[in-house]
Protein backbone atom coordinates (compact mmCIF):
# COMPACT_ATOMS: atom_id res chain seq x y z
CA UNK A 1 0.00 0.00 0.00
CA UNK A 2 0.96 3.63 -0.28
CA UNK A 3 2.84 4.29 2.93
CA UNK A 4 3.87 7.66 4.29
CA UNK A 5 6.83 8.14 6.59
CA UNK A 6 6.20 10.95 9.05
CA UNK A 7 9.10 13.03 10.36
CA UNK A 8 8.81 15.64 13.09
CA UNK A 9 11.61 18.03 14.00
CA UNK A 10 12.20 20.66 16.65
CA UNK A 11 9.89 21.69 19.45
CA UNK A 12 7.03 22.90 17.29
CA UNK A 13 7.22 19.95 14.90
CA UNK A 14 7.24 17.45 17.73
CA UNK A 15 4.29 19.03 19.48
CA UNK A 16 2.21 19.19 16.31
CA UNK A 17 3.35 15.68 15.45
CA UNK A 18 2.40 14.27 18.83
CA UNK A 19 -1.08 15.79 18.51
CA UNK A 20 -1.38 14.45 14.97
CA UNK A 21 -0.69 10.89 16.14
CA UNK A 22 -3.34 11.26 18.84
CA UNK A 23 -5.89 12.28 16.19
CA UNK A 24 -4.89 9.58 13.71
CA UNK A 25 -4.79 6.85 16.35
CA UNK A 26 -8.23 7.88 17.47
CA UNK A 27 -9.53 7.64 13.89
CA UNK A 28 -8.10 4.17 13.46
CA UNK A 29 -9.21 2.92 16.86
CA UNK A 30 -5.73 2.46 18.28
CA UNK A 31 -5.10 2.96 21.97
CA UNK A 32 -1.91 4.41 23.52
CA UNK A 33 -0.31 0.97 23.74
CA UNK A 34 -0.74 0.37 20.01
CA UNK A 35 -3.55 -2.15 20.41
CA UNK A 36 -6.58 -1.99 18.15
CA UNK A 37 -9.93 -1.41 19.84
CA UNK A 38 -11.95 -0.18 16.90
CA UNK A 39 -15.44 -0.99 15.73
CA UNK A 40 -15.07 -1.17 11.96
CA UNK A 41 -12.94 -3.13 9.53
CA UNK A 42 -12.43 0.03 7.53
CA UNK A 43 -10.17 1.31 10.28
CA UNK A 44 -7.73 -1.53 9.66
CA UNK A 45 -8.08 -1.89 5.92
CA UNK A 46 -5.35 0.59 5.07
CA UNK A 47 -3.89 1.21 8.46
CA UNK A 48 -0.44 0.47 7.09
CA UNK A 49 -0.25 3.89 5.43
CA UNK A 50 0.85 5.32 8.76
CA UNK A 51 1.44 2.26 10.94
CA UNK A 52 3.66 -0.75 10.89
CA UNK A 53 2.25 -3.93 12.38
CA UNK A 54 4.69 -5.31 14.92
CA UNK A 55 4.68 -8.61 16.78
CA UNK A 56 1.63 -9.36 18.89
CA UNK A 57 -0.58 -7.19 16.68
CA UNK A 58 0.80 -3.89 17.96
CA UNK A 59 0.59 -0.97 15.58
CA UNK A 60 3.65 1.26 15.56
CA UNK A 61 3.67 4.66 13.83
CA UNK A 62 6.01 5.13 10.88
CA UNK A 63 7.33 8.19 12.64
CA UNK A 64 10.80 9.62 13.09
CA UNK A 65 11.22 12.13 15.90
CA UNK A 66 14.23 14.43 15.93
CA UNK A 67 15.37 17.38 18.00
CA UNK A 68 18.64 18.91 19.08
CA UNK A 69 17.66 18.91 22.73
CA UNK A 70 15.97 16.20 24.77
CA UNK A 71 13.28 18.35 26.41
CA UNK A 72 10.39 18.20 23.96
CA UNK A 73 10.92 14.53 23.24
CA UNK A 74 10.77 13.70 26.90
CA UNK A 75 7.39 15.38 27.09
CA UNK A 76 6.21 13.53 23.97
CA UNK A 77 7.35 10.31 25.59
CA UNK A 78 5.52 11.21 28.77
CA UNK A 79 2.45 12.34 26.84
CA UNK A 80 -0.73 10.30 26.31
CA UNK A 81 0.56 8.43 23.24
CA UNK A 82 4.25 8.46 24.15
CA UNK A 83 4.50 4.68 24.42
CA UNK A 84 3.16 4.23 20.92
CA UNK A 85 6.38 5.22 19.18
CA UNK A 86 9.29 2.96 18.53
CA UNK A 87 11.99 3.91 21.07
CA UNK A 88 14.78 3.72 18.48
CA UNK A 89 13.03 6.36 16.41
CA UNK A 90 13.71 9.14 18.90
CA UNK A 91 16.88 10.86 17.70
CA UNK A 92 18.06 13.81 19.74
CA UNK A 93 21.14 15.82 20.59
CA UNK A 94 21.93 17.56 23.86
CA UNK A 95 23.12 21.01 22.88
CA UNK A 96 20.05 22.60 21.28
CA UNK A 97 20.08 24.88 18.26
CA UNK A 98 19.25 28.02 20.23
CA UNK A 99 16.88 29.35 17.54
CA UNK A 100 19.86 29.53 15.22
CA UNK A 101 19.28 28.22 11.70
CA UNK A 102 23.01 27.83 11.09
CA UNK A 103 23.37 25.53 14.10
CA UNK A 104 20.52 23.37 12.84
CA UNK A 105 21.71 23.30 9.24
CA UNK A 106 25.49 23.38 9.41
CA UNK A 107 26.92 22.52 12.82
CA UNK A 108 24.86 20.80 15.52
CA UNK A 109 22.26 19.46 13.10
CA UNK A 110 24.84 18.24 10.62
CA UNK A 111 26.41 16.08 13.33
CA UNK A 112 23.10 14.42 14.15
CA UNK A 113 21.73 14.14 10.62
CA UNK A 114 23.26 10.77 9.78
CA UNK A 115 21.63 9.03 12.70
CA UNK A 116 18.29 10.56 11.67
CA UNK A 117 18.79 9.39 8.09
CA UNK A 118 19.50 5.86 9.34
CA UNK A 119 16.12 5.79 11.07
CA UNK A 120 14.38 7.29 8.02
CA UNK A 121 16.01 4.68 5.82
CA UNK A 122 14.93 1.88 8.14
CA UNK A 123 11.34 3.15 8.08
CA UNK A 124 11.40 3.53 4.30
CA UNK A 125 12.71 0.01 3.88
CA UNK A 126 9.83 -1.29 5.96
CA UNK A 127 7.39 0.03 3.36
CA UNK A 128 5.89 -1.93 0.48
CA UNK A 129 5.49 1.01 -1.82
CA UNK A 130 6.55 4.23 -0.17
CA UNK A 131 4.48 7.15 -1.36
CA UNK A 132 6.47 9.87 0.29
CA UNK A 133 7.37 11.76 3.42
CA UNK A 134 5.52 14.31 5.49
CA UNK A 135 7.41 16.63 7.79
CA UNK A 136 6.05 18.82 10.58
CA UNK A 137 8.33 21.66 11.63
CA UNK A 138 8.41 25.40 12.17
CA UNK A 139 10.43 27.86 10.14
CA UNK A 140 11.13 30.34 12.91
CA UNK A 141 13.34 28.33 15.24
CA UNK A 142 16.66 26.58 14.78
CA UNK A 143 16.07 22.84 14.69
CA UNK A 144 12.83 22.51 12.73
CA UNK A 145 13.94 25.12 10.23
CA UNK A 146 17.69 24.52 9.92
CA UNK A 147 17.91 20.82 10.53
CA UNK A 148 14.48 20.22 9.01
CA UNK A 149 15.56 21.70 5.69
CA UNK A 150 18.88 19.83 5.87
CA UNK A 151 16.97 16.58 6.30
CA UNK A 152 14.64 17.44 3.43
CA UNK A 153 17.55 17.97 1.07
CA UNK A 154 19.25 14.73 2.18
CA UNK A 155 16.05 12.69 1.87
CA UNK A 156 15.45 14.30 -1.50
CA UNK A 157 18.87 13.14 -2.65
CA UNK A 158 18.18 9.59 -1.61
CA UNK A 159 14.52 9.36 -2.69
CA UNK A 160 14.28 11.80 -5.60
CA UNK A 161 11.02 10.40 -6.97
CA UNK A 162 9.04 10.32 -3.70
CA UNK A 163 6.73 13.11 -2.67
CA UNK A 164 8.03 15.45 0.02
CA UNK A 165 5.20 17.25 1.78
CA UNK A 166 5.86 19.62 4.64
CA UNK A 167 3.55 21.21 7.19
CA UNK A 168 5.48 24.34 8.00
CA UNK A 169 4.59 26.78 10.75
CA UNK A 170 5.55 30.19 9.42
CA UNK A 171 6.37 33.06 11.78
CA UNK A 172 3.23 35.12 12.26
CA UNK A 173 3.05 38.90 11.99
CA UNK A 174 1.97 39.75 15.54
CA UNK A 175 2.95 36.70 17.56
CA UNK A 176 6.73 36.45 17.51
CA UNK A 177 8.71 34.01 19.61
CA UNK A 178 12.23 35.03 18.65
CA UNK A 179 13.86 38.10 17.19
CA UNK A 180 15.72 36.20 14.49
CA UNK A 181 12.61 34.50 13.08
CA UNK A 182 12.78 36.44 9.78
CA UNK A 183 16.32 35.16 9.20
CA UNK A 184 15.49 31.56 9.99
CA UNK A 185 12.30 31.63 7.95
CA UNK A 186 13.86 33.22 4.88
CA UNK A 187 16.76 30.76 4.90
CA UNK A 188 14.24 27.92 5.19
CA UNK A 189 11.96 29.13 2.40
CA UNK A 190 15.07 29.35 0.21
CA UNK A 191 15.46 25.59 0.79
CA UNK A 192 11.78 24.66 0.59
CA UNK A 193 11.37 26.31 -2.80
CA UNK A 194 14.04 24.01 -4.19
CA UNK A 195 13.57 20.76 -2.28
CA UNK A 196 9.96 20.29 -1.16
CA UNK A 197 7.07 19.18 -3.38
CA UNK A 198 4.23 20.65 -1.37
CA UNK A 199 4.38 23.02 1.58
CA UNK A 200 1.23 23.59 3.64
CA UNK A 201 1.69 26.93 5.35
CA UNK A 202 0.29 27.37 8.82
CA UNK A 203 0.82 30.20 11.21
CA UNK A 204 0.09 30.70 14.85
CA UNK A 205 -1.67 34.01 14.52
CA UNK A 206 -4.25 32.66 12.10
CA UNK A 207 -4.75 29.69 14.41
CA UNK A 208 -5.19 32.01 17.41
CA UNK A 209 -7.77 33.99 15.44
CA UNK A 210 -9.70 30.84 14.64
CA UNK A 211 -9.64 29.86 18.31
CA UNK A 212 -10.80 33.30 19.50
CA UNK A 213 -13.32 34.18 16.81
CA UNK A 214 -14.78 30.92 15.70
CA UNK A 215 -14.17 28.47 18.50
CA UNK A 216 -14.82 31.11 21.19
CA UNK A 217 -11.90 29.96 23.33
CA UNK A 218 -10.83 32.76 25.65
CA UNK A 219 -7.32 31.46 26.36
CA UNK A 220 -6.25 29.12 23.56
CA UNK A 221 -3.27 26.92 24.37
CA UNK A 222 -0.76 25.47 21.93
CA UNK A 223 -2.66 22.22 22.40
CA UNK A 224 -5.76 23.82 20.89
CA UNK A 225 -3.75 25.24 17.99
CA UNK A 226 -2.08 21.91 17.32
CA UNK A 227 -5.44 20.22 17.34
CA UNK A 228 -6.55 22.44 14.47
CA UNK A 229 -3.39 21.68 12.53
CA UNK A 230 -3.71 17.95 13.00
CA UNK A 231 -7.32 18.03 11.80
CA UNK A 232 -5.94 19.53 8.62
CA UNK A 233 -3.10 17.04 8.26
CA UNK A 234 -5.36 14.07 8.84
CA UNK A 235 -7.77 15.43 6.23
CA UNK A 236 -5.07 15.67 3.59
CA UNK A 237 -4.23 11.99 3.86
CA UNK A 238 -7.71 10.72 4.61
CA UNK A 239 -8.20 9.34 1.11
CA UNK A 240 -5.16 7.16 1.48
CA UNK A 241 -6.39 5.67 4.70
CA UNK A 242 -10.09 5.17 4.12
CA UNK A 243 -12.06 4.11 1.07
CA UNK A 244 -13.71 6.89 -0.88
CA UNK A 245 -15.62 7.67 -4.03
CA UNK A 246 -13.07 10.11 -5.39
CA UNK A 247 -9.60 9.39 -4.19
CA UNK A 248 -6.60 11.59 -3.93
CA UNK A 249 -3.09 11.07 -2.63
CA UNK A 250 -0.04 13.25 -2.13
CA UNK A 251 1.01 12.85 -5.75
CA UNK A 252 -2.43 13.62 -7.18
CA UNK A 253 -2.57 16.66 -4.95
CA UNK A 254 0.74 17.86 -6.32
CA UNK A 255 -0.28 17.29 -9.92
CA UNK A 256 -3.55 19.15 -9.47
CA UNK A 257 -2.31 21.99 -7.31
CA UNK A 258 1.06 22.99 -8.74
CA UNK A 259 0.89 24.78 -12.09
CA UNK A 260 4.53 25.96 -11.91
CA UNK A 261 7.17 24.05 -10.00
CA UNK A 262 8.24 26.83 -7.63
CA UNK A 263 4.71 27.79 -6.64
CA UNK A 264 4.00 24.96 -4.24
CA UNK A 265 3.06 26.82 -1.08
CA UNK A 266 -0.54 26.13 -0.07
CA UNK A 267 -2.99 27.72 2.30
CA UNK A 268 -4.77 25.22 4.49
CA UNK A 269 -8.31 25.46 5.72
CA UNK A 270 -10.68 23.19 7.58
CA UNK A 271 -14.44 23.16 8.03
CA UNK A 272 -16.60 22.89 10.03
CA UNK A 273 -14.86 24.88 12.73
CA UNK A 274 -17.26 24.73 15.62
CA UNK A 275 -16.43 25.19 19.25
CA UNK A 276 -16.04 21.94 21.13
CA UNK A 277 -19.38 22.23 22.90
CA UNK A 278 -21.67 23.26 20.06
CA UNK A 279 -20.99 20.54 17.51
CA UNK A 280 -24.08 18.50 18.12
CA UNK A 281 -26.55 21.35 17.66
CA UNK A 282 -26.43 21.70 13.91
CA UNK A 283 -26.36 19.42 10.92
CA UNK A 284 -24.02 20.57 8.20
CA UNK A 285 -24.75 20.56 4.51
CA UNK A 286 -22.34 20.47 1.61
CA UNK A 287 -23.18 24.09 0.61
CA UNK A 288 -22.51 25.24 4.18
CA UNK A 289 -19.19 23.42 4.29
CA UNK A 290 -18.18 24.87 0.95
CA UNK A 291 -19.16 28.32 2.08
CA UNK A 292 -17.15 28.04 5.28
CA UNK A 293 -14.18 26.40 3.60
CA UNK A 294 -13.58 29.34 1.26
CA UNK A 295 -14.04 31.87 4.04
CA UNK A 296 -10.89 33.88 4.74
CA UNK A 297 -11.45 33.39 8.48
CA UNK A 298 -10.96 29.66 8.02
CA UNK A 299 -7.46 29.90 6.59
CA UNK A 300 -4.73 28.62 8.85
CA UNK A 301 -2.20 31.12 7.58
CA UNK A 302 -2.40 34.89 7.84
CA UNK A 303 -2.90 35.70 4.18
CA UNK A 304 -6.24 36.86 2.90
CA UNK A 305 -7.26 34.93 -0.22
CA UNK A 306 -9.40 37.90 -1.26
CA UNK A 307 -6.21 39.87 -1.89
CA UNK A 308 -5.12 37.46 -4.60
CA UNK A 309 -6.47 34.85 -6.95
CA UNK A 310 -6.56 31.09 -6.73
CA UNK A 311 -4.37 29.36 -9.27
CA UNK A 312 -5.74 26.02 -8.10
CA UNK A 313 -7.51 24.59 -5.08
CA UNK A 314 -8.37 21.21 -3.71
CA UNK A 315 -11.26 20.23 -1.48
CA UNK A 316 -11.02 16.95 0.39
CA UNK A 317 -14.48 16.10 1.69
CA UNK A 318 -15.09 13.49 4.36
CA UNK A 319 -18.35 11.83 5.26
CA UNK A 320 -21.40 10.43 3.52
CA UNK A 321 -22.50 12.80 0.80
CA UNK A 322 -23.39 12.77 -2.86
CA UNK A 323 -20.50 13.40 -5.20
CA UNK A 324 -22.91 15.14 -7.54
CA UNK A 325 -23.68 17.69 -4.86
CA UNK A 326 -19.99 18.23 -4.19
CA UNK A 327 -19.30 18.83 -7.87
CA UNK A 328 -22.23 21.22 -8.17
CA UNK A 329 -21.10 23.22 -5.17
CA UNK A 330 -17.56 23.47 -6.50
CA UNK A 331 -18.80 24.75 -9.86
CA UNK A 332 -21.12 27.09 -8.06
CA UNK A 333 -18.25 28.62 -6.07
CA UNK A 334 -16.17 29.06 -9.20
CA UNK A 335 -19.00 30.69 -11.15
CA UNK A 336 -20.09 33.04 -8.39
CA UNK A 337 -16.59 34.20 -7.48
CA UNK A 338 -14.96 33.84 -10.85
CA UNK A 339 -12.81 36.93 -10.32
CA UNK A 340 -10.97 35.10 -7.53
CA UNK A 341 -9.92 32.21 -9.78
CA UNK A 342 -7.50 32.67 -12.66
CA UNK A 343 -9.41 32.18 -15.88
CA UNK A 344 -6.50 30.61 -17.71
CA UNK A 345 -6.83 27.42 -15.67
CA UNK A 346 -10.42 26.23 -16.26
CA UNK A 347 -12.01 23.96 -13.61
CA UNK A 348 -9.20 24.61 -11.21
CA UNK A 349 -10.77 23.05 -8.12
CA UNK A 350 -10.09 19.39 -7.55
CA UNK A 351 -12.38 17.61 -5.13
CA UNK A 352 -12.18 14.25 -3.49
CA UNK A 353 -14.65 12.45 -1.27
CA UNK A 354 -13.76 10.02 1.47
CA UNK A 355 -16.56 8.12 3.19
CA UNK A 356 -15.30 8.21 6.76
CA UNK A 357 -15.73 11.53 8.61
CA UNK A 358 -13.44 12.59 11.48
CA UNK A 359 -14.39 11.64 15.05
CA UNK A 360 -17.46 13.46 16.28
CA UNK A 361 -18.54 14.97 12.95
CA UNK A 362 -21.00 13.86 10.27
CA UNK A 363 -19.04 15.51 7.49
CA UNK A 364 -16.00 17.71 7.19
CA UNK A 365 -13.76 19.15 4.54
CA UNK A 366 -10.08 20.00 4.33
CA UNK A 367 -9.14 22.74 1.94
CA UNK A 368 -5.82 23.35 0.20
CA UNK A 369 -5.50 26.42 -1.95
CA UNK A 370 -2.68 27.60 -4.15
CA UNK A 371 -3.44 31.29 -4.01
CA UNK A 372 -1.29 34.19 -5.15
CA UNK A 373 -2.25 35.92 -1.89
CA UNK A 374 0.30 33.80 -0.06
CA UNK A 375 2.87 36.28 -1.32
CA UNK A 376 1.69 38.55 1.53
CA UNK A 377 3.23 36.11 3.93
CA UNK A 378 6.57 36.00 2.13
CA UNK A 379 6.55 39.78 1.70
CA UNK A 380 6.00 40.28 5.39
CA UNK A 381 8.86 38.00 6.39
CA UNK A 382 11.01 39.48 3.64
CA UNK A 383 10.52 43.03 4.87
CA UNK A 384 11.48 42.06 8.41
CA UNK A 385 14.49 40.20 7.03
CA UNK A 386 15.65 43.18 4.99
CA UNK A 387 15.24 45.59 7.88
CA UNK A 388 17.63 43.55 10.04
CA UNK A 389 19.96 42.40 7.29
CA UNK A 390 20.55 45.94 6.07
CA UNK A 391 22.12 46.68 9.44
CA UNK A 392 23.69 43.22 9.65
CA UNK A 393 21.95 42.81 13.01
CA UNK A 394 22.45 39.42 14.70
CA UNK A 395 24.51 38.20 11.75
CA UNK A 396 27.48 37.20 13.90
CA UNK A 397 25.46 34.32 15.36
CA UNK A 398 25.24 32.86 11.87
CA UNK A 399 28.67 33.72 10.49
CA UNK A 400 30.13 32.33 13.70
CA UNK A 401 28.75 28.92 12.69
CA UNK A 402 30.54 29.21 9.36
CA UNK A 403 27.81 30.77 7.24
CA UNK A 404 28.55 33.32 4.56
CA UNK A 405 26.65 36.57 4.07
CA UNK A 406 26.29 35.52 0.47
CA UNK A 407 23.84 32.83 1.53
CA UNK A 408 21.64 35.45 3.18
CA UNK A 409 21.66 37.57 0.04
CA UNK A 410 20.77 34.56 -2.09
CA UNK A 411 17.93 33.54 0.22
CA UNK A 412 16.60 37.08 0.20
CA UNK A 413 16.58 37.32 -3.58
CA UNK A 414 15.08 33.84 -3.96
CA UNK A 415 12.20 34.89 -1.73
CA UNK A 416 11.75 38.16 -3.62
CA UNK A 417 11.66 36.21 -6.88
CA UNK A 418 9.00 33.95 -5.42
CA UNK A 419 6.88 36.98 -4.52
CA UNK A 420 7.19 38.44 -8.00
CA UNK A 421 6.33 35.10 -9.60
CA UNK A 422 3.10 34.98 -7.60
CA UNK A 423 2.40 38.59 -8.55
CA UNK A 424 3.05 37.89 -12.22
CA UNK A 425 0.46 35.10 -12.33
CA UNK A 426 -1.99 37.13 -10.26
CA UNK A 427 -1.96 39.83 -12.94
CA UNK A 428 -1.87 37.42 -15.87
CA UNK A 429 -5.05 37.08 -17.91
CA UNK A 430 -5.88 34.71 -20.72
CA UNK A 431 -5.30 37.52 -23.25
CA UNK A 432 -1.79 38.20 -21.94
CA UNK A 433 -0.86 34.63 -22.64
CA UNK A 434 -1.43 35.09 -26.37
CA UNK A 435 0.79 38.17 -26.44
CA UNK A 436 3.50 36.31 -24.54
CA UNK A 437 3.38 33.47 -27.04
CA UNK A 438 3.75 35.89 -29.92
CA UNK A 439 6.78 37.51 -28.29
CA UNK A 440 8.40 34.12 -27.80
CA UNK A 441 7.79 33.19 -31.42
CA UNK A 442 9.53 36.29 -32.81
From Swiss-Prot:
Pfam families linked to this entry: Tubulin, Tubulin_C
Q: Where in the cell is it found?
A: Cytoplasm, Cytoskeleton
Q: Per UniProt, which keywords does this protein have?
A: Cytoplasm, Cytoskeleton, GTP-binding, Magnesium, Metal-binding, Microtubule, Nucleotide-binding
| Domain of life of the organism encoding this protein | Eukaryota
Per UniProt, Mg(2+) binds at 69
Q: Which family does it belong to?
A: Belongs to the tubulin family.
Query: What role is this protein assigned?
Result: Tubulin is the major constituent of microtubules, a cylinder consisting of laterally associated linear protofilaments composed of alpha- and beta-tubulin heterodimers. Microtubules grow by the addition of GTP-tubulin dimers to the microtubule end, where a stabilizing cap forms. Below the cap, tubulin dimers are in GDP-bound state, owing to GTPase activity of alpha-tubulin.
Spell out the note in the miscellaneous section. Answer: The sequences of the two genes coding for beta-tubulin are identical.
Subunit structure, per the record?
A: Dimer of alpha and beta chains. A typical microtubule is a hollow water-filled tube with an outer diameter of 25 nm and an inner diameter of 15 nM. Alpha-beta heterodimers associate head-to-tail to form protofilaments running lengthwise along the microtubule wall with the beta-tubulin subunit facing the microtubule plus end conferring a structural polarity. Microtubules usually have 13 protofilaments but different protofilament numbers can be found in some organisms and specialized cells.
Name by which UniProt lists this protein: Tubulin beta chain
Its source organism is Stylonychia lemnae (Ciliate)
Q: What is the lineage of its organism?
A: Eukaryota, Sar, Alveolata, Ciliophora, Intramacronucleata
- Its gene? TUBB1
